């Protein structure tokens, strides 16, 4: 595997955050008129209860650093290897970009709609994502690598997504984010000696924000049944596979990050998939068969393809570009074969909302 490119300056951190690749977090824009037309009257009781939870803001005091934070960084993180340092910094840059992406999207929606239900929801979620992004960025500043988030908002490319794509992708992003954070938190709770950075102490209450955000999109989707039935299930299937595959490949580019926490990347990812599959039964009548032999083989092949693409890119020149194109085509073919693997089907529960019980 090629060495992870180093992040040693704020300029490199900003460049990494602005990247637009298949694996990097993106910034989105959407159809605000369609967002304004969202109708949640069919799930009004659950919706109002959820907004009351946002109003209660049980994490309002959570994203504050303790006096011991910087001291723990100095004592514990100084002992990590250069390779782990770079993988962790890459994780922080990717995470702050992802959190800020949600902040930007939700804020733009709330500014461009009049629908009071949508406006209130987006304002609350933008508030939460702003806290998350700011907390991660503060951790980057400890290394002199803080990112100018205002500049990132102005200069990073935006991708247009129809509202239904926003719902599918963001629901899954929030729920898989919960599954990732809670799995890491539980692991380090059992093995505190492997907590090499204090930010992981915040993950339990933090991931409950992610879970609640996902609940919001679950309610929207269940209030519009046509989005989770018929031909739209083909899109659900696509986004399930795309989100899982992106996570799997990205995580396997950071093997030392998981190893340092006492996790193995493949085992960790399938635990996250399992949790996300269970959660997503609240809204999707299908789930990926993550135990299917062809699914697991396909994931491994996508990792190999990514390594080959990176090697071709590093080679450069005409030959390198041709190799990149060939391996990209191989990756697309692998994804297509995985898309055709039979899915598991199940009935939707009468009650939409769930508790974060993992």
UniProtKB/Swiss-Prot annotation:
<dbReference type="GO" id="GO:0036070">
    <property type="term" value="P:light-independent bacteriochlorophyll biosynthetic process"/>
</dbReference>
<dbReference type="InterPro" id="IPR008434">
    <property type="entry name" value="AcsF"/>
</dbReference>
<keyword id="KW-0077">Bacteriochlorophyll biosynthesis</keyword>
<dbReference type="Pfam" id="PF02915">
    <property type="entry name" value="Rubrerythrin"/>
</dbReference>
<keyword id="KW-0521">NADP</keyword>
<dbReference type="GO" id="GO:0048529">
    <property type="term" value="F:magnesium-protoporphyrin IX monomethyl ester (oxidative) cyclase activity"/>
</dbReference>
<keyword id="KW-0602">Photosynthesis</keyword>
<keyword id="KW-0479">Metal-binding</keyword>
<comment type="function">
    <text>Catalyzes the formation of the isocyclic ring in chlorophyll biosynthesis in aerobic conditions. Mediates the cyclase reaction, which results in the formation of divinylprotochlorophyllide (Pchlide) characteristic of all chlorophylls from magnesium-protoporphyrin IX 13-monomethyl ester (MgPMME).</text>
</comment>
<dbReference type="InterPro" id="IPR009078">
    <property type="entry name" value="Ferritin-like_SF"/>
</dbReference>
<keyword id="KW-0560">Oxidoreductase</keyword>
<comment type="pathway">
    <text>Porphyrin-containing compound metabolism; chlorophyll biosynthesis.</text>
</comment>
<dbReference type="InterPro" id="IPR003251">
    <property type="entry name" value="Rr_diiron-bd_dom"/>
</dbReference>
<keyword id="KW-0149">Chlorophyll biosynthesis</keyword>
<dbReference type="GO" id="GO:0015979">
    <property type="term" value="P:photosynthesis"/>
</dbReference>
<dbReference type="GO" id="GO:0005506">
    <property type="term" value="F:iron ion binding"/>
</dbReference>
<protein>
    <recommendedName>
        <fullName>Aerobic magnesium-protoporphyrin IX monomethyl ester [oxidative] cyclase</fullName>
        <ecNumber>1.14.13.81</ecNumber>
    </recommendedName>
</protein>
<comment type="similarity">
    <text>Belongs to the AcsF family.</text>
</comment>
<keyword id="KW-0408">Iron</keyword>
């Amino acid at each position: 595997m090629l060495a992870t490119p180093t992040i040693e300056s704020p300029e490199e951190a900003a460049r990494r955050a602005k990247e637009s690749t298949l694996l990097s977090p993106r910034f989105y824009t959407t159809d605000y008129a369609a967002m304004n037309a969202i109708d949640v009257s069919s799930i009004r009781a659950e919706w109002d209860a959820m907004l009351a939870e946002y109003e209660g803001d049980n994490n309002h005091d959570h994203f504050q650093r303790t006096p011991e934070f910087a001291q723990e960084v100095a004592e514990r993180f100084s002992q990590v290897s250069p390779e782990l340092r770079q993988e962790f910094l890459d994780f922080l840059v990717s995470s702050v970009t992802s959190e800020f992406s949600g902040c930007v999207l939700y804020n733009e929606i709330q500014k461009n709609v009049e629908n009071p239900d949508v406006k209130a929801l987006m304002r609350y979620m933008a508030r939460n994502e702003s806290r998350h992004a700011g907390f991660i960025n503060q951790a980057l500043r400890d290394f002199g690598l803080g990112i100018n988030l205002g500049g990132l908002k102005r200069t990073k490319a935006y991708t247009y997504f129809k509202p239904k794509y926003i719902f599918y992708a963001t629901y899954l992003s929030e729920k898989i984010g919960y599954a990732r954070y809670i799995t890491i938190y539980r692991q380090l709770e059992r093995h505190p000696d492997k907590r090499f950075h204090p930010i992981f102490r915040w993950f339990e209450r933090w991931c409950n924000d992610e879970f609640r955000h996902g609940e919001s999109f679950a309610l929207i989707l269940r209030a519009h049944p046509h989005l989770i039935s018929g031909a739209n299930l083909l899109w659900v299937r696509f986004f399930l596979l795309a989100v899982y595959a992106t996570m799997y490949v990205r995580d396997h580019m950071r093997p030392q990050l998981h190893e340092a926490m006492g996790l193995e990347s493949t085992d960790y990812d399938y635990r996250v998939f399992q949790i996300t599959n269970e959660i997503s039964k609240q809204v999707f009548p299908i789930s990926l068969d993550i135990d299917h032999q062809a699914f697991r083989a396909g994931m491994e092949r996508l990792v190999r393809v990514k390594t080959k693409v990176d090697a071709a890119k590093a080679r450069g020149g005409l030959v390198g570009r041709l190799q990149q194109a060939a391996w990209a085509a191989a990756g697309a073919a692998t994804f297509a074969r995985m898309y055709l693997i039979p899915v598991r089907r199940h009935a939707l529960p009468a009650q939409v909302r769930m508790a974060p019980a993992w």
